[in-house]
Amino acid sequence: QSSAQEHSQLPVGTPVNLRKLLAETLELQTVASRKDVATLARYTDCPHSAPALKALAEDDYKAQVQQKRVSVLELLERFPACDLPFGVFLELMPLLTPRYYSISSSPLQSPERCAITVGVVSDPALSGNGTFEGVCSNFLAQSPEGATIHASLRDTSDGFRLPEDPSVPIIMVGPGTGIAPFRGFLQERAALKDSGKAIGEAILFFGCRHPDQDFVYRDELEGYAKDGIADLHVAFSRQEQSKVYVQDKLREERDAVWALLENGAKIFICGDGSRMEPDVR
């Protein structure tokens, strides 16, 4: 009950399946905080495990917990001598938060349907123990065709919308699943062009590893290029010995990009901002 007061979304007053509770309401893979680790240490009487947990909560925390993204659950598996009450465990766990995806389709093309582009996350855990699997991406990948998925819509920021005037040129940079919103942009402009409206020039810089592995929407994108909806420039980072990224393609096409910018083009970037955006800029 005390846990539920702080976690108001937890089911209270009704029986609940333990698996459902853990899988659908709690963030089990969240990195343990110093306070979390110290709490585990307080519930550990083992003369070997207790000092080890105390060290992880203090000097060793950054290198051994934070940087390796070790969760409370993983620490409990590593230190079975910890006698943490389940109610306290619930108090330590944050609630499952929404996962946000860009809609990768246009209502002008499919008014009653929307698409999302999801990369399934399943990689070796940074801790070196097991596999880190994305909660939502794997849930979606494992859902059978025809399954009902509960979702909500959020309005996008004003800065990430197609110009109201379709004749304004646009430049799009999106490696990997960063292609998602731009697929919607291109569908929108294709529909506008089909309706007889003039559309501005567009350039799409897309990046993936290999043309035969993860060139998503290849036929569709090449079709847009053929139809004059957008110039397509694709960077393959694993096709040859030398790695090519979207920023390299931007550099190659700098004259065309600069010409569009001088003509009032709007530029959009979607992807891993921490690594790609500085190079793009």
Where on the chain are the PLM-derived regions?
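FNR-like FAD-binding dehydrogenase module
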Residues: 1-281
